[in-house]
């Protein structure tokens, strides 16, 4: 998870000022073969996602340059622009950080970067999830409340601003709970191994459980519920219109109550939601399993853990491909 750590790193009954914990060399992590494969695939996905998302942003920029009379981007293109920015931010922070951390195994960047990068990591994970909520809400309102949407031209931009603001606020606790710890031998002397973890940040075990559940809910459960509800309302509304007058949904006609372009954006929204759900569900299910059964880490192999994480990283790669497919 975004703020998870190993059981040894999450002891609650300890001094908050303690910066070293007793570990043995046998407990130290190492870069295994599966870890090397994870690093290789992570950097490959980093290049792929950066290329796809940067290309889409460049395409939007060129499109605005060609527009005549200073016309602005459509609302859907503005939403896609911010989703792409969020995906690019996640790509540029999460993927290199994970890849380099797996190579070095321990943390060399110091206390300040431990806190700042932990904050930026969670911020960059919140942003795409919240932007998916904004897109789903906007498309749902466009179908179910079209007059209200037209009368409030600033609604979309307000939701976008709120998504970025909440992402920055909800990631704030990372600056407090993450810190550097050092390996200590039996005599209490540090042995040069350091790590960036949440050790001693939570006075009681349930404090950490609550925070983990909060981040899990904001990153996955709440966005998923919003997307399901919004898409269900869209389907219900379209089904009702179809039953009232089947000719209203004939795509081959130029004059439709629901134009072909709008139906295409609706399909694209559903595809975005499907990509988000399929890519992230295995990763978060594994995280929930670990909360209820910490010994699970000893039963699930490292390659499986690595696969679920890498599968989640496909999401920012898929989004620009989805837009490209529906733009053909």
Swiss-Prot record:
Residues 60-84, 137-157, 230-271, 328 are cytoplasmic. Residues 1-38, 106-115, 179-208, 293-306 are extracellular. InterPro entries: GPCR_Rhodpsn, GPCR_Rhodpsn_7TM, GphnRH_fam_rcpt. It is a multi-pass membrane protein. Keywords: Cell membrane, Disulfide bond, G-protein coupled receptor, Glycoprotein, Membrane, Receptor, Transducer, Transmembrane, Transmembrane helix. Gene3D superfamilies: Rhodopsin 7-helix transmembrane proteins. It is found in: Cell membrane. The chain crosses the membrane at residues 39-59, 85-105, 116-136, 158-178, 209-229, 272-292, 307-327. The keyword Glycoprotein applies. Disulfide bonds join 114-196. Glycans are attached at residue 18. GO terms for molecular function: gonadotropin-releasing hormone receptor activity. GO terms for cellular component: plasma membrane. GO terms for biological process: cellular response to hormone stimulus; G protein-coupled receptor signaling pathway. Coiled coil: none annotated. Receptor for gonadotropin releasing hormone (GnRH) that mediates the action of GnRH to stimulate the secretion of the gonadotropic hormones luteinizing hormone (LH) and follicle-stimulating hormone (FSH). This receptor mediates its action by association with G-proteins that activate a phosphatidylinositol-calcium second messenger system. Belongs to the G-protein coupled receptor 1 family. This is Gonadotropin-releasing hormone receptor. It comes from Equus caballus (Horse). The lineage of its organism: Eukaryota, Metazoa, Chordata, Craniata, Vertebrata.
């Amino acid at each position: 998870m975004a703020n998870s750590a190993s059981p040894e790193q999450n002891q609650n009954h300890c001094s908050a000022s303690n910066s070293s914990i007793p570990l043995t060399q046998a407990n130290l992590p190492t870069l295994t073969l599966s870890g090397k494969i994870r690093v290789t695939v992570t950097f490959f996905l980093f290049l792929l996602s950066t290329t796809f998302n940067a290309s889409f942003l460049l395409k939007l920029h060129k499109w605005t340059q060609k527009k005549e009379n200073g016309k602005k981007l459509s609302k859907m293109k503005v939403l896609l622009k911010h989703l792409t920015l969020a995906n690019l931010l996640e790509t540029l922070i999460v993927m290199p950080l994970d890849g380099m951390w797996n190579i070095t195994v321990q943390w060399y960047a110091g206390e300040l970067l431990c806190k700042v990068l932990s904050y930026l990591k969670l911020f960059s994970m919140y942003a795409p999830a919240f932007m998916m909520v904004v897109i789903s809400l906007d498309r749902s309102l466009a179908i179910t409340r079209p007059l209200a949407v037209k009368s409030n031209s600033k609604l979309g931009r307000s939701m976008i601003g709120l998504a970025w603001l909440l992402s920055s606020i909800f990631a704030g606790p990372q600056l407090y709970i993450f810190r550097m710890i050092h390996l200590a031998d039996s005599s209490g002397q540090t042995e040069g191994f350091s790590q960036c973890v949440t050790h001693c940040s939570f006075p009681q075990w349930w404090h950490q459980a609550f925070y983990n559940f909060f981040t899990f809910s904001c990153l996955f459960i709440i966005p998923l519920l919003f997307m399901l509800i919004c898409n269900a309302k869209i389907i219900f509304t379209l089904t009702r219109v179809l039953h009232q007058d089947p000719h209203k949904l004939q795509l081959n006609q130029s004059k439709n109550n629901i134009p072909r372009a709008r139906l295409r954006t609706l399909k694209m929204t559903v595809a975005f939601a499907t990509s988000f759900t399929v890519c992230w569900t295995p990763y978060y299910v594994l995280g929930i399993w670990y909360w209820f059964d910490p010994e699970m880490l000893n039963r699930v192999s490292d390659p499986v853990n690595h696969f679920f994480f890498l599968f989640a990283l496909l999401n920012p790669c898929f989004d620009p491909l989805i837009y490209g497919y529906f733009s053909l």
